[in-house]
Amino acid sequence: MSGTKWTDEQRQAIFTKDCNLLVAAGAGAGKTAVLVQRIIEKILDKGEPIDIDKLLVVTFTNAAAAEMRERIGDAISKGLDEDPESKVLRKQLTLLNKSNIMTIHSFCLQVIKNNFHTMEIDPNFRICDETEGILMKQEAIDELFDELYEIENEDFINLVESYASRKDTRLQEVVLELHRFAKSAPFSYDWLLNMAEEFNVGEEFNFEETPWADMIMEDMKVLLHGFKNMLQQSIDVILNSEGIDYYYEPFKMDLSFINSLLEKSSFKEFRGEIIAYDFPKLPLKRNKDADKEAKERVKKLRDKVKKKIVELKNILDSYENEFIKKEFIFLYPSMKALSNLVILFDKKYEAKKRERDLIDFNDIEHLCLSILTDKNSEGHIIPSDIALDYRKKFAEVLIDEYQDSNLVQEVIMSMVSRVKGYWSFYNGQLMFNEEEINLEEPQICLDIPNRFMVGDVKQSIYRFRQAKPEIFLDKYNEYSEEEGTKNRKVKLFKNFRSRKEVINGVNYLFKQIMSKTIGELDYTEEEALKVGASYGEEVKGEPIELCLMDKKYEISEEVLKEYNVDEEEALDNIQLEGRLVAKKIQKLVGNNLEGGLKVFDKKLGEYRNLQYRDIVILMRATSNWAPIFVEELAKEGIPVFADTNSGYFDTAEIKTMISLLQIIDNPLQDIPLLSVLRSPIASFTDDELIDIRMVNKNITFYECMEIIYRLYKNEKLDSYYSFYIEDENKINKIIKDMNEKLKNKICSFIEKLKLWREKSIHIDIDEFIWFLYVETGYYGYAGALQAGEQRQANLRILFQRAKQYAKTSYKGLFNFINFINKLKFSSGDMGSAKILGENENVVRIMSIHKSKGLEFPVVILSGTGKNFNMTDLNKNILFHRDLGYGPDYVDTERRIAYPSLVKNIIKNKIRLETLSEEMRILYVALTRAREKLIITGLINNMDKTVEDWLNLSEDKNKVPEYAVMSGKTYLDWIGPALIKHKDAVSFREELKMTSELSNIVDDKSKWKIELWNKRELLKEKVEEDEVEISEKIKETLMNLEESNYKEEIYKRLSFKYKYDNASSIPTKLSVSDVKKQFILDEKENTEELFKKLELRKPMFMEEKKKISPSERGTIIHLFMQHLDLKKAENEEDIKEQINRLIEREFITYEQSKVISPYKILKFCRGELGKRILNSNNVNKEMPFSIEIPALEIYKELDKEIYKDEKLIIQGVIDCYFEEEDGLVLLDYKTDYVNDIEEIKNRYEIQIKYYEEALNRITGKNVKDKYLYLFSVDNYIKID
């Protein structure tokens, strides 16, 4: 029936039968089409057709299931058009509605509903809403903690003291996270208990024989391979350079040592050899003909190897068996208590769900698992009778997106598939054993395997949902490509989506960086994508573009002045990357003289001009970056939409409605009440609110309104209100003098509020919210505003949430507000309502995860210089599904806390798995592009970074694994791969990287690497603004030529004030202003520095921006002002001090992120920190004002006229302290430092005035003056 021309590999995937078939389908390989065609061939087979309801087809999403059902229905309908009398086709069309094409959760739910009698659940059970589940979990854990405190459970108390810090919430979070994590294991109680028992070691314990030891050794061997390459590279240089051959022997010995370590299989031998090795000293021969550059280069490489080996020695030296044994024994009670605590919590949570006849999302899989599994007499997990019935029913089980399966899903699918074997626990891990098992009823058709699995492990990007790509990989490595085998694999790597330029670039990059270590698969020629799409010769493909910008490209104040740009705008790197992307889009779409890109339209079958809708900007995460990009693109007139999961609760209409609900529940809340009173719902003015507050400043705002209401209505005040009225006559006078209109307004609002409070009790919350929309007119008002359709859509979402809540077991307005608050914080906010159609002509911004399965003519991947998110590694207890618990070692009696050995191992394992996930996410991003791919990113210190990339280019075929392992951004991977590509030559030349590369790669992929800088982007922006302004000026001047007042206008515009020089001199100057004046070119006119006041938008009207460098400096200065050096012994102490400032609301949490505990600790432990500690007289943030002659600053002024003019210089001294022989002045600087001498010159005059101020104020000598530079963690002395 299909007219599609299938490739040989696709035909194998469609027609191969009687085996377990794994189809590895690369990006754009048409796997959905293949899966659908396989189903169609099965149900329409002329020899042995299979009814469609005898197939189980498991998809990843409901949308995928619906699409698959639709495709199959279309194919059957098309067949009926050709053969209307076909009984087979008619039957299959009828059965299609009964087909088992569904998600794994839908299948599990079907199993539960058909077999609820085997479980202790009500047949009328309901699946609880996610937020309802969160509320129940919080109730359960609060009750559990209260109970355990009450009975003074010793294990629980010890656990709290060790891991709860100051609040129980931290331990509660650990329990909730571990509970969620354990639910990804098929038998979660077994997993929890087994993981705790790993710490229960006896006297016979030998760490060297554990899997942990092997893991340490294997991870270190990856680094050793890198060291081997470095040493081999050094030997090559020695042999090919003049006069340094005497280095050959020691380098050869080092290389032999590394090779010996790589061959070791015993951890004991590996550890012993690395600890015992001493690097031989290099000969001190002098040879005047020696190649000094080569000599220095190999010495640097060897020093780097030596340093790393010493680090490994220190790590291995700490892995002493007795020490580790004691650590395990000490941690065992806590870990056992933790497992038991999670089990107790789960039982309490289960009881709460049973009371309400509820199950949650996790229960669906676990209940299904318990229905489908039994244990035999040997404790092996085997299929139940119900599972055997499913094996009889399903002729084939087809699983889509198999790479995203978790272990629970894998066990479920194995129970209903015809596979030989059983599951059992081995060393705490659930393993599948492919062996015969004895069943009371013989297994059905076990000789005919019936599993079809399709996916791409390179696109497995859901590890955070506990997806386990190893399930796919194990089969991929074990299954054979030979015909006739019972476990077979087929590879579909021909890409029918992208141009060859995109495919060649993707292949080049991932051959360089993806490996079993990072990515969990070697990306070889065999795994590489093959070109399958044809774009003809009419339009040539373009190279992949890499656009880089240096974060540290310093813009001088002169440049800022020249382009009239303030510091914040100039230095917001995300904003500038957004501006760069906007420029690229303008060029692509053709908003300039060069014309735009042509793309092929599949529907039209021809090329057309690129439209905005053809472009997507992909980001790793959109929450912080997308709004800034939207702003920049909008400035350039580019229509744009950002698909984010945030911002909904910040919209004005939702904040107003939630405030209204809050005061209906409890009006004694000033902030939400004032929000409603100022809104169109009540329309009070600021002056009216002030009049109300004058009644009494010591009670709530509502109580003030209530007093006015009662006295105005001549109602008697009860004792509660009378208590707050000190002078009733005074209050009566205030009310008497009050505007009559205001009093009526207050009465009207109070009466409405009382009515609403009463009504909220008697109707469901969703009805009540809609009643408020209509009663207040707010829904109609929101619709009349700008973006009214969007605002009303947001209000409808709140109504839908209320409707959803009304179906839960929780009732009432108070609980609904809690429900919304939990939704806000547990789900991390959510995006605004989507009112945008698919065909809207806008550029879309979305996360890489949301783009999976989609394709776009043009893809721009941005934010590639952003660090990977590794914050989870800092938690005090880590969890790993295979390795178990990784806790901190906490001894409360001795007040000792440090990461345990097993935590360090697990931390490294999770880090590598996270990097592998990031590698696959990068692959997904790059393979979304059909015709054009652009990558943008910011780099810290371009010259140094590129130099580092060049040092990693010794192997032309692969970026060293150790370098990939140490990567912190996508650019850390992309850069070293591309720097040795033949297309990077001009880029290297632009950076004046003249050193020759011996390993330039002549690959067929095409790249264009561009270096952008901030000055360039600022200049372009200003030039565009200037063109627009000049056009307006021209238009005005043309009109002026025809004006009767032309001469008078020119005369007035040409007027010059006689004492203009004097008017430009301020009466006060800050020290920073003085500094600026002194660093200006001597010829520069003073007026340029102190221009007349320019009007800007007030801050409250400015759009929210990221923390600027100047704000960063202010935050760090504020912290240093409050820093207690006596309580700063480690980073934890400093974090505590940061948290204290947050709690006292000196800084926000977002602002606290710019303070580096590591850098602060370096200051505290440094010379200046120690001197401050030893001083008995330390002063911080001391303001001063001193008077000086104006001519001291303004030397160009007439000396006779201005000899008596004075200026006030004012400033704030960061810190000064007293020692025996004088004062020490200290000033903190957060500037980026490029040149020490330049920094000294820049701040010399500033420090001079600080010194003069201290001399005048204290009468004491300033003996030392220092600048402390946080960017380099060091100080410089000012002479």
UniProtKB/Swiss-Prot annotation:
UvrD-like helicase C-terminal domain residues: 526-853
GO MF annotation terms: 3'-5' DNA helicase activity; 3'-5' exonuclease activity; ATP binding; ATP hydrolysis activity; double-stranded DNA binding
Pfam name, any one: UvrD_C
Catalysed reactions, as listed in the record: Couples ATP hydrolysis with the unwinding of duplex DNA by translocating in the 3'-5' direction; ATP + H2O = ADP + phosphate + H(+)
Domain (UvrD-like helicase ATP-binding): residue spans on this chain: 4-499
Job description of the protein: The heterodimer acts as both an ATP-dependent DNA helicase and an ATP-dependent, dual-direction single-stranded exonuclease. Recognizes the chi site generating a DNA molecule suitable for the initiation of homologous recombination. The AddA nuclease domain is required for chi fragment generation; this subunit has the helicase and 3' -> 5' nuclease activities.
HAMAP family given in the database record: AddA
Name of this protein: ATP-dependent helicase/nuclease subunit A
Organism: Clostridium botulinum (strain ATCC 19397 / Type A)
Gene: addA
